[in-house]
UniProtKB/Swiss-Prot annotation:
ATP binds at G170, D171, R172, Q173, T174, G175, K176, T177. Belongs to the ATPase alpha/beta chains family. The keyword Signal does not apply. PANTHER family: ATP SYNTHASE SUBUNIT ALPHA, MITOCHONDRIAL. Pfam families: ATP-synt_ab (PF00006), ATP-synt_ab_C (PF00306), ATP-synt_ab_N (PF02874). InterPro entries: ATP_synth_asu-like_sf, ATP_synth_asu_C, ATP_synth_asu_C_sf, ATP_synth_F1_a_nt-bd_dom, ATP_synth_F1_asu, ATPase_a/bsu_AS, ATPase_F1/V1/A1_a/bsu_N, ATPase_F1/V1/A1_a/bsu_N_sf. F-type ATPases have 2 components, CF(1) - the catalytic core - and CF(0) - the membrane proton channel. CF(1) has five subunits: alpha(3), beta(3), gamma(1), delta(1), epsilon(1). CF(0) has four main subunits: a, b, b' and c. Its main location: plastid. One of its GO terms (cellular component) is proton-transporting ATP synthase complex. The keyword Translocase applies. It catalyses: ATP + H2O + 4 H(+)(in) = ADP + phosphate + 5 H(+)(out). The record marks S363 as: Required for activity. This is ATP synthase subunit alpha, chloroplastic.
């Protein structure tokens, strides 16, 4: 017969009493009413907050943007194929945030900051909210440092400063992404962290951009956030905010950052899809009423913070695609009004072989010469006006048969100026090389060459200066001024090289 030992029983009871936990856990739950098209309608979830993350029974995460009288509209961050009607949903009490750290440099991630490049997990101990407030007026200062793109047309006539928002706008296939990627390539050695956000693009296009960065050593200082065309609309809508959160992390650590959103038209389309499925009332072009706020709260996060917040900066280059050059459509006008200027790429110029196809006449930088070094101001001050006058004269000259000598000379000069602005893709130029190029054109040294010889001569001249006259580059980089000494060195080099070049061409 089994003997019952009273002290053993009392010990067990005592242990159980000690382990008893009186904590009451209140979980805010709901039930799925319907699910489909990346949207779920939930009954219950009475205490849920706007924008709160919710978790479904099978693990899918969603965001609750629509709080209605008898149900909650949730957008899914995934396909949601395993979610069933009647399954339970619980509120998490958190809003969307991502891990951030230096370890993200050189990686390709998705909108949830998960790596998609097959190179393992990314370790991070710090988190940032995907949507964080933009710096206020007092915590900003005006833009004063240049951010060199390496493209002569931009750095000389439409300069971009650190902390500026400059829109790149144009039709499809006009080289918008090329301008943005060249700018990233030109940041090598400039201590600038770059974030490239690809929204709704073909996976092959993103892979091509990443390959270019890897070949040119740009991935060392770049993070690529990619949500391709087959991603759910929710993730395409979130991707730019994820990129901004990563760039802000570096900005507040006193680093300079550059972020490219490629492109915001596709983000607006993804947001429109979400809003219409949530049955929000449509407005102009069927976009919801808050599509302006969608972009303004994103682009206002780019800033040049005041010295109290450190000497970091976040420069944004949003890209917007137009339909047959129509900049008066809804999204283009919205983003133009938010940004500090725009670079307009023209399909006509692109097809005429002028690449980058920047229409200098209607492109503008609202920061202006504050974002240029003194040497560039000295050399390129009049070039925008000269090109505008040339374009006007060229249009007029089509109808005139006999032109006087002065007009012919002005047309010849304009054609050569336009020629020197042409650049091959992925070949950005340093500031000193740009100064050499512009000075040679604006001072008439190219007038004696044929148009077809201009680019060949300029390559030869820049190579000669780099190898034989390194002091020119030293003067520009140390003083940032186009001094008399620098001008003397340059004049001498141009005259030497032009004579040599003409001799070579004759033989």
């Amino acid at each position: 017969m089994v003997t019952i030992r009273a002290e053993e029983i009392s010990n067990i009871i005592r242990e159980r009493i000690e382990q008893y936990n009186r904590e009451v856990k209140i979980v805010n739950t709901g039930t799925v009413l319907q699910v489909g098209d990346g949207i779920a309608r939930i009954h219950g979830l009475d205490e849920v907050m706007a924008g709160e993350l919710v978790e479904f029974e099978e693990g899918t995460i969603g965001i609750a943007p629509n709080l209605e009288s008898n149900n909650v509209g949730v957008v899914l961050m995934g396909d949601g194929l395993m979610i069933q009607e009647g399954s339970s949903v619980k509120a998490t009490g958190r809003i969307a945030q991502i891990p951030v750290s230096e370890a993200y440099l050189g990686r390709v991630i998705n909108a949830l900051a998960k790596p998609i490049d097959g190179r393992g997990e990314i370790l991070a101990s710090e988190y940032r909210l995907i949507e964080s407030p933009a710096p206020g007026i007092i915590s900003r200062r005006s833009v004063y440092e240049p951010l060199q793109t390496g493209l002569i047309a931009i750095d000389s006539m439409i300069p971009i400063g650190r902390g500026q928002r400059e829109l790149i706008i144009g039709d499809r296939q006009t080289g918008k992404t090329a301008v943005a990627t060249d700018t990233i390539l030109n940041q090598k050695g400039q201590n600038v962290i770059c974030v490239y956000v690809a929204i709704g693009q073909k996976a092959s296009s993103v892979a091509q951009v990443v390959t270019t960065f890897q070949e040119r050593g740009a991935m060392e200082y770049t993070i690529v956030v990619a949500e391709t065309a087959d991603s759910p609309a929710t993730l395409q809508y979130l991707a730019p905010y994820t990129g901004a959160a990563l760039a802000e992390y570096f900005m507040y650590r006193e680093r300079h950052t550059l972020i490219i959103y490629d492109d915001l038209s596709k983000q607006a389309q993804a947001y429109r899809q979400m809003s219409l499925l949530l049955r929000r009332p449509p407005g102009r072009e069927a976009y919801p009423g808050d599509v302006f706020y969608l972009h303004s709260r994103l682009l206002e996060r780019a800033a040049k913070p005041s010295s109290r917040l450190g000497e970091g900066s976040m420069t944004a280059l949003p890209i917007v695609e137009t339909q047959s050059g129509d900049v008066s459509a809804y999204i283009p006008t919205n983003v133009i009004s938010i940004t500090d200027g725009q670079i307009f790429l023209s399909a006509d110029l692109f097809n005429a072989g002028i690449r980058p196809a920047i229409n200098v006449g209607i492109s503008v930088s609202r920061v202006g010469s504050a974002a240029q070094i003194k040497a560039m101001k000295q050399v390129a001050g009049k070039s925008k006006l000269e090109l505008a006058q040339f374009a006007e004269l060229e249009a007029f000259a089509q109808f005139a048969s006999d032109l006087d000598k002065a007009t012919q000379n002005q047309l010849a000069r304009g054609q050569r100026l336009r020629e020197l602005l042409k650049q091959s893709q992925s070949s950005p130029l340093a500031v000193d090389e740009q100064i050499v190029t512009i000075y040679t054109g604006t001072n008439g040294y190219l007038d004696q060459l044929e148009i077809g010889q201009v680019r060949k001569f300029l390559v030869q001249l820049r190579t000669y200066l780099r190898t034989n006259k390194p002091q020119f580059q030293e003067i520009i980089s140390s003083t940032k001024v186009f001094t008399e000494q620098a001008e003397a060195i340059l004049k001498e080099a141009i005259q030497e090289q032009i004579e040599l070049f003409l001799l070579q061409e004759q033989t």
